[in-house]
Swiss-Prot record:
Quaternary context: Interacts with protoporphyrinogen oxidase 1 PPOX1. Interacts with PCMP-H52/MEF10. Homodimer and heterodimers with MORF1/RIP8, MORF2/RIP2, MORF3/RIP3, MORF4/RIP4, MORF5/RIP5, MORF6/RIP6 and MORF7/RIP7. Interacts with RBG3/ORRM3. Interacts with PCMP-A2/PMD1. Interacts with ORRM1 and VAT3/OZ1. Interacts with PCMP-H13/MEF35. Interacts with RBG5/ORRM4. Interacts with ORRM6.
Family as reported in the entry's similarity comment: Belongs to the MORF family.
Entry keyword Chloroplast: yes
Species of provenance: Arabidopsis thaliana
Subcellular location: Mitochondrion; Plastid, Chloroplast
Protein name according to UniProt: Multiple organellar RNA editing factor 8, chloroplastic/mitochondrial
Region ranges (Disordered): 211-395
Comp. bias intervals (Pro residues): 240-300, 335-355
Function according to Swiss-Prot or TrEMBL: Involved in organellar RNA editing. Required for the processing of numerous RNA editing sites in mitochondria and plastids. Binds to the plastid RARE1 factor, a pentatricopeptide repeat-containing protein involved in RNA editing.
Extent of the transit peptide: 1-56
Length: 395
């Protein structure tokens, strides 16, 4: 069985306050208000039952659970854990289910202390039968901070008290001061209330302040800074500019992609490129301007501008110095410069090789290739020592 401890602390005036706050510790096992004793509540015999809060018309109505409706369960000859443990196991001192704290509705207007006490007597008199007997059953009252009185009645009468119109709660009372066995409130002795002293509510005020502090801490949102940081990050993601990303696919292409880039100057010891390379974009004139040309008799690359783009000048090797009288490579129209194949330039510290792939030079004399056509005289269009004997090649 669960044991619940609540505090006896009901809010002070004004009278139209929405709720009463208890800081007076007591157990809760009163019957359901404004309803007949039901079999469900009669069978639920907890040691200290919880009370539930239900808002009605802006007011808090707390209802405790009831124990046996006909006889006190403390007097059960066969107590067991299915109904309620014996009295020796009760944890709250003073909670004997004979002392009851009766909480009533706040009085209307600004009644005096005596008028408030008189209303308590009349309320209890509806149950015990007379005001005189009611006076003798009351052991404490509260006319400040909260409105309640303590009544020494049986558990059966506590059920009837709950059915009254002006009664909010009827709860088992317990000691507020265990050492002095004091239930708290303003003592009511022999049918009379002692003069009021603020000390009677000092303990309640302290307990009420502690309860308010606990409520304030519980109501404060947790992880406040973390929540603000999360909101700030979400706003940045929603409205801020997209983050800068590096370009996809790697670095940008080099400036001369798609064409033949000139080699770096003096790379590998070669001569620098001609000064006017790439300035004249027109193709160079063909070697034989006066008539048709024929392909060379060997597998050398085609002549300049012959049916397609000009191949590299040094295609697989080093050509002779004056390649058929063709213009030098300074007006190549974007073609790669000399020595693109890695071969040595003309007269690179040595004489070019005597034979170009084992075939005679391409542009020495075209007397045998033309058909009666006047060919220009290329007296000096052969490499020196072409045949190895020191004489020019004779066709």
């Amino acid at each position: 069985m669960a044991t619940h401890t609540i505090s006896r602390s009901i809010l002070c005036r004004p009278a139209k306050s929405l709720s009463f706050l208890f800081t007076r510790s007591f157990a809760s096992s009163a019957p359901l208000a404004k309803s007949p004793a039901s079999s469900l509540l009669s069978r639920s015999r907890p040691l200290v039952a919880a009370f539930s809060s239900v808002f009605r018309g802006g007011l808090v109505s707390v209802k405790g659970l009831s124990t046996q409706a006909t006889s006190s369960s403390l007097n059960d000859p066969n107590p067991n854990w299915s109904n309620r443990p014996p009295k020796e196991t009760i944890l709250l001192d003073g909670c004997d289910f004979e002392h009851w704290l009766v909480v009533v509705e706040p009085p209307q207007g600004e009644p005096t202390r005596d008028e408030i006490i008189d209303s308590y007597i009349k309320t209890l008199a509806q149950i015990v039968g007379s005001e005189d007997e009611a006076r003798m059953k009351i052991y404490s009252v509260s006319t400040r901070c909260y409105y309640a009185f303590g009544a020494l009645v049986s558990e059966d009468l506590s059920h009837k008290l709950k059915e009254l119109s002006n009664v909010r709660w009827v709860l088992p009372d317990s000691y507020l001061d265990v050492r002095n066995k004091d239930y708290g409130g303003e003592p009511f002795i022999d049918g009379k209330a002692v003069p009021y002293d603020p000390k009677y509510h000092e303990e309640w005020i302290r307990n009420n302040a502690r309860a308010n502090e606990r409520n304030r801490r519980n109501d404060r949102p947790r992880n406040n800074d973390r929540s603000r940081n999360f909101e700030r990050r979400r706003e940045n993601m929603a409205g801020g500019p997209p983050p800068q990303r590096p370009p996809m696919g790697g670095p940008p292409p080099p400036p001369h992609i798609g064409g033949s880039a000139p080699p770096p100057p003096h790379m590998g010891g070669s001569a620098p490129p001609p000064p006017h390379m790439g300035q004249n974009y027109g193709p160079p004139p063909p070697n034989n301007m006066g008539g048709p040309r024929h392909p060379p008799p060997y597998g050398a690359p085609p002549q300049n501008n012959m049916g397609g783009p000009r191949p590299p000048q040094n295609y697989g090797g080093t050509p002779p110095p004056n390649y058929g009288g063709a213009p030098p490579a300074n007006n190549m129209g974007g073609a790669p410069p000399p020595n693109y194949g890695g071969g040595p330039p003309p007269q690179y510290g040595a004489v070019p090789p005597p034979q170009y792939g084992g075939a005679p030079p391409q542009n020495n004399n075209y007397q045998q290739q033309g058909s009666g056509m006047q060919q220009p005289q290329y007296q000096n269009n052969y490499p020196p020592n072409r045949d190895g004997s020191g004489n020019p090649y004779q066709g």
